[in-house]
Design a protein with these regions (language model features):
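Secondary-structure junction/capping motif
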Residues: 6, 41-44, 481, 491-492
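Short amphipathic alpha-helical segments, especially helix-boundary/capping motifs
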Residues: 21-22, 41, 143-145, 430-435
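Extended non-catalytic accessory segments flanking core domains
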Residues: 33-298, 302, 306-318, 349-351, ...
Length: 575
């Protein structure tokens, strides 16, 4: 959890004492009856929590009584503990648990009376500073409340803040972006979460929010030496499942978060795919966003030569795994052909070493634009032959102009025209007017992407057997994709990939397809298959090439987390 002790007032930190240990489970019930506390409480915990998001007693000093349910007092933890009333009130709107920011030594099942000031800390109701913690006996362990997501009647989690919970049913790993940095993982009830604008059923924003839960590690350490859920070197992937999640519900940095009292175990439900699913055909075409392949250090890609070598090794492994005849690339450094040549040279060296028989060349971009990154084609000179020269567009709607190149099987056959693209991103920097976020789920610059799609549709209409591919920064049910489909182009991933597997990117825990392969009518009849190779979006980012913060033992020169986008692959029957 991102909770910094340094952000605490000095007086509060001065009041903290020695730390206690991490709870590894809920203690068994004890038969001994607790003695009466000498100092009575003057408020119930439910009164402190109130019926809303914030405490009605904020700023006041109160004295509450309860039983310790979780102890996270170490300096690398939350520097406090959770207390819960063993006799809850009858109001379902109020919580009967609360966080106590104090390192006064306590243990789970201690019956305590705590005196402290009620504050809202990043949205969490807690007692801080604490002037007294009186331990007055040992109580029966508080049994966790059983809950299931989504909650009934659209109820929120506020009523469970500070309460010991057990989540019933299976939960699916849906986001690991901050697993390596903060020890956080997002899970969801009922399966993977999808972008509402990607055309999946039951994926509205409200439904997604009701099904998701952030699981924290009860720690304030950033970039911990030991990353959760990496036992025996096996790293959790999105789609893996857990059950019986148990812990105390906290809140911070805009999210409810479960602080586990029992370490979750994730079962492998989404095995790593060593190679793409077969797509058939005599020519295979791939689309791959390289996530800023730069030979220039310290720009968008690698910061050091060592990182650049690590990135290159992973990119080569991914390209060799795709085993494609033509590959459309995105986010290649726009520094002439320097970065592109370095990638192709490394790919050919690896191919020669293994005797794969492939020798790749690249297509020069006639007008790559002025952006720091560009699109590119690499192709196997033994299996396909370029037909005519490369073309592009000087339409100022493009920040990164497309690249158009026709290819024919080297042994003879039908030609097709590949059009590789990288549309304007969804980031909102500088967006105004129609490019501003319209609140329709398509984020910023959708109007620009619609214009880009229309321009590409015109290029495709004039091309022989067009295949539009690349990172279109648009999910499958958004306006730009509709423009292309209305122009007669057909999504081959929608056609061949099962709905639950149709995603290439994960953002804020939501899976969706930003990368696309769309074929013209005649070429679509020659498509033998399509797949999305999930080697990147399901993997945590601490597996990538970066050396800062990423534990060295997890790096492998393989395809997994070679980028943040999954590559796409289609098969064509052209002979």
């Amino acid at each position: 959890m991102r909770r910094s002790a340094a952000a605490r007032p000095a007086a509060v930190l001065a009041a903290a004492a020695v730390t206690a240990g991490l709870v590894t489970g809920v203690a068994p019930a004890a038969a001994a009856a607790p003695a009466a506390c000498a100092v009575p409480a003057d408020h119930e915990i439910a009164d402190v929590q109130g019926t809303g998001d914030a405490s009605p007693l904020a700023g006041r000093t109160v004295r509450v009584e309860g039983v310790v349910t979780a102890d996270f007092q170490r300096s690398d933890q939350l520097r406090g503990f959770f207390v819960q009333d063993p006799t809850p009130d009858d109001d379902p709107r109020t919580s009967d648990g609360i966080f106590v920011y104090s390192t006064r030594e306590v243990n789970v099942r201690d019956r305590v009376v705590v005196t402290g000031k009620v504050v809202e800390y990043h949205g969490l109701t807690e007692l801080s500073p604490v002037s007294a913690v009186d331990v007055c006996g040992t109580a029966r362990a508080i049994a966790p409340d059983n809950v299931r997501l989504p909650l009934e009647d659209g109820a929120g989690l506020e009523r469970f803040e500070g309460v010991l919970l057990r989540f019933r049913g299976q939960m699916v790993a849906s986001e690991t972006y901050d697993l390596g940095r903060y020890g956080e993982i997002t899970v969801a009830a009922g399966g993977r979460l999808y972008q509402p604008t990607d055309g999946h059923d039951d994926s509205s924003q409200a439904e997604n929010e009701a099904r998701r839960l952030l699981v924290d590690d009860a720690s304030n350490v950033q970039n911990p030496d030991t990353i959760p859920y990496t036992a025996d070197g096996r790293v959790v992937r999105l789609g893996d499942v857990t059950a019986g999640l148990t812990g105390v519900l906290s809140y911070g940095f805009g999210s409810y978060r479960l602080q586990p009292t029992r370490s979750p175990h994730f079962a492998r439900a989404n095995p790593r795919p060593d190679k793409p699913r077969p797509v058939g055909g005599d020519v295979r075409v791939a689309s791959f966003n390289t996530l800023n392949w730069f030979t220039t250090l310290g720009r968008r890609g690698a910061d050091t030569a060592a990182e650049r070598d690590r990135q290159l090794a992973k990119l080569v492994a991914a390209l060799r795994g795709l085993d494609a005849d033509v590959v459309g690339l995105m986010e290649v450094e726009n520094n002439g052909d320097t970065a592109l040549k370095a990638l192709v040279d490394a790919l050919n060296a690896a191919s020669a070493e293994t005797g794969s028989g492939r020798t790749y060349a690249w297509t020069a971009h006639p007008y790559p634009g002025t952006d720091e990154i560009k699109v590119a084609f690499v192709y196997d000179t033994a299996t396909v032959t370029p037909v005519g020269g490369p073309r592009s567009s000087r339409d100022d709607v493009f920040d990164r102009p497309p690249l158009v190149q026709a290819f024919r099987p080297a042994a003879g056959g039908t030609a097709f025209t590949a059009i590789v693209n990288h549309f304007k991103s969804k980031g909102c920097g500088g967006a105004s007017g129609p490019d501003a976020d319209q609140g329709d789920g398509q984020s910023c610059y959708n109007a620009r992407r619609v214009k880009q799609a229309a321009a590409i549709a015109e290029l495709a209409a004039a091309a022989e057997n067009p295949l539009v591919l690349g990172d279109l920064n648009s999910y499958a049910a958004e306006d730009p994709i509709e423009v292309l489909e209305d122009a007669g182009l057909t999504s081959q991933t929608k056609r061949f990939v099962d709905d639950e597997d149709r995603y290439s990117y994960v953002y804020m825990g939501l899976s969706g397809e930003l990368d696309h392969m769309l074929a013209g009518p005649a070429l679509a009849r020659r498509v033998t298959g399509a797949t999305i190779w999930h080697v990147n979006s399901d993997e945590p980012r601490f597996l990538d090439y970066n050396t800062e913060y990423n534990p060295a033992e997890f790096y492998r020169p393989d395809a997994f987390r070679s980028s943040d986008h999954d590559p796409l692959l289609v098969g064509l029957d052209l002979r």
